[in-house]
Amino acid sequence: MTEPIVRFQDVHKSFGDFDVLKGINLDIKPAEKVAVIGPSGSGKTTIIRMLMTLEEPSSGDIIVDGKNLWKMKKKEKMVKANEKHLREVRGDIGMVFQHFNLFPHMTILENCMTAPIHVKKENKEEVRDRSVKMLERVGLGDKLDSYPNQLSGGQKQRVAMARALVMRPKIMLFDEVTSALDPELVGEVLEVIRDLAKHEDMAMVLVTHEMDFALDIADKVLFLDEGVIAEQGTASEVIEHSENERLQGFLRRFRG
Ligand SMILES: Nc1ncnc2c1ncn2[C@@H]1O[C@H](COP(=O)(O)OP(=O)(O)OP(=O)(O)O)[C@@H](O)[C@H]1O
């Protein structure tokens, strides 16, 4: 049986007295596409931030590609070793946020090239070739020398995706990547993600409010409700056929 690329084992997360995640158990297979849906405040972004190693669990284990993220720190109190370990894991994970976080003073080609060259110390020419190919792939081959402020929101989001992909991640995380876009720009961004989902064998985790999109691309959908996974299954099982009343209420609010 294939080992999961991501495993959450009884993960809890509290901020002060507030328990945001209350025992998350989750396996994601290496090429699996997972959509996370749920009401505002249910803990979706916290799961993504934990995967990105930006938040440490209050208890439980998070294992990414066989590496137990915080174990070293807990067991050996070796903070430096743990930081190295986390850096390695981060190298395998690409993330696209709601806001694009591009570097405004760099062209879009430079935006894509900077991390592989400066963080991974890769060969500049090789990175340039890969970056050009990725920008072509997201439909921006004619904008290599443009600056972020010369692009639309949808184009900026596509640069953000290309920039993450140039790092050749094993896992891509998408946190509500269309929610800051004007409605007419949503389609072009979803189209790029759809293309990646259908043709790339990396794992993908998407927090999304686009139910039809989740139905189309997700192998698995998780319904997060008040810090627990209240329902999970295939997209059709969760979005079309679940009898969970809170999930049905949540979906009705989307469908109007
Ligand atoms: N650093 C923090 N300090 C305190 N509370 C936090 C922190 N981060 C998140 N929270 C709280 O945890 C809860 C879950 O937040 P999270 O962003 O994970 O929810 P979400 O499901 O992604 O919501 P939304 O759909 O609105 O983005 C919220 O009530 C939020 O206010």
Predicted regions and their residues:
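C-terminal boundary and immediately downstream tail of ABC-type ATPase nucleotide-binding domains
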Residues: S236-G256
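ABC family nucleotide-binding domain
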Residues: P4-A235
